[in-house]
Structures are given as structure tokens and as C-alpha cells.
Amino acid sequence: MARTVTATFRLDRLLLAPTAQQPLKPGGATASFQDRLAMVEILCRGEARFEPSALDAPRIHNEPNYTIDTLRYLRAEFSDTPEIYSIVGADSFLDLRRWRSPDQLLAIVNWIVVSRPGFALSALNKLDLTPEQRAHVYPLEGVTEPVSATEVRDCLREGRDCSELVPYDVLSYIREHHLYGV
């Protein structure tokens, strides 16, 4: 998906940043932030425009990582960059009104919304967005990941062959570090 988005939108660089603590996902991640960042680093090897980032590292006192804070930081850090895009799955974007400061989120960056299994991009039409906000939303068909992260974790936990779902080096890391019940 990352390659398709980078090529389609002619992105110079793509930051890939795991989130330490997502406020809308109770229970948190099933692997540590350090392990998830290490897997992102593995995925970025050999991809000139991909850059792993720890910008959503754990906060002081385990406070949640809010997207608005991350995007404000990026907007300030890359103030000379006219276009900044955030890439999100349709399932998450449809929940945008539950996020902190949703109207500001739609104003400070552009959003590339990719289809996800069970979430048609046509559902974006039902979102209560102004024309100005809609101008910052770019639905992208045809990059649906055939499997979700939950399905990958289940596959690993059940001991099934996941080699077609997960790159070899990432799968090796998962096994070496006994992640996801492997």
C-alpha cells in the first residue's frame, strides 16, 4: 500500500510511525512500541522514500498519542513543505468525529483515505464535512490490503504459514522476539 500511495501522489518522502498509545483503541498494542518501530525499520530497508519515525513514541506518564499533536508538530517541522498528507484507512477515517479536534485535523493536512475490507470509500460521502474540508480528503481505491493486522496476528498465534502476509525479514523478527504468541 505504501508504495502505491507514494507513487500515486508523487510523495518525496513517507514517514512511517507506529503509535505508542492510540486513545480510541482500548487495551493498546499487542507488541511494544520498540518492537513495532523495529519492524517498521525493517520494512523501510531498501525503500529510498520510506523513513521510519519514532515521532509517536510513548509520552510522559503514558498519555495517549493524539493525531492532532503529531500533525501540528509535522506542520511546524516542515513549514516550508506546502503539502503534507496523512494516510489513513477508511475504517479509521469514518470515525474521525471521535478524534480530538477533528475540524483542525481536516484543516492542517491533506488526507489520503485508502479502502479497507468491509469499508467502501463511498461511505465517506456520509461524513459531515464542509466543502472546504472535503477538498483536503483524497479517497484512493484499489489499495485495499487483503488482510488486517488482526488477521495476521491470529495467523501467527495459530501457527499457520503467514509468509504471504508478512515480509520474510519482519516474520523473522517476530519469531526471534516471540511476538504475538509465536
Task: Name each region found by the language model.
Residues 1-182:
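Nucleotidyltransferase catalytic core that binds NTPs
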